[in-house]
């Protein structure tokens, strides 16, 4: 075979591999990290405290906006697991009605890491909706709660509840995505007095709406 024919054959072989090489270089990684700003809208459910004339749902936990980081691993194009993290968040507590009127009951800190299994639709498109379900582990700490002039109050240290979510990623570049996400989480605790007697059940059960960006690698 002449040199020119060999060169033509090699060139043809190299050109034929270009689509596969291009596909490999643009293939998305299994990991995604997102940063979001999340509005925590608390449910504010609670059982009554008859001894203080506190009616049902009169204990209100502050709603607020918090930072959030999540780490997602894609097992396949459609199936993923997401770990949602933040730092302990301070929540003020108010009692809207009681025998001594409305009052500020203090505050507590809440750390609610959440793990969900997800199904991602349209994984090769720019618009990629998903749904998920899993568990939330709520760690309550630093509680400074009280009924003025009557007693101090305490929350149970932890609670494990369900979580569901829906959202979407929108592809901006090969690695960068815009994200919106909504979650509902079970976050609950028993409220006890200094003697360790349960006086109420508090249901924070927030709806969390987040907006942010993700990086896939």
Sequence positions of predicted segments:
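Outer-membrane beta-barrel domain signature
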Residues: 56-60, 102-106, 151-155, 198-200
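Short glycine/proline- and aromatic-enriched beta-strand/turn motifs that initiate or cap beta-hairpins
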Residues: 23-70, 216
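Cleavable N-terminal export/targeting peptides
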Residues: 1-29
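Membrane-spanning beta-strand positions in outer-membrane beta-barrel proteins
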Residues: 32, 80, 126-128, 171, ...
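Outer-membrane beta-barrel translocator domains and adjoining extracellular loop/strand segments
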Residues: 45-52, 92-100, 141-150, 190-197
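Predominantly the C-terminal beta-signal and adjacent terminal strand-loop region
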Residues: 90-94, 173-217
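Residues that define the transmembrane beta-barrel architecture of outer-membrane proteins
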Residues: 29, 63-67, 107-113, 127, ...
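Gram-negative (and chloroplast) outer-membrane scaffold detector with strong preference
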Residues: 39-41, 70-146, 206-216
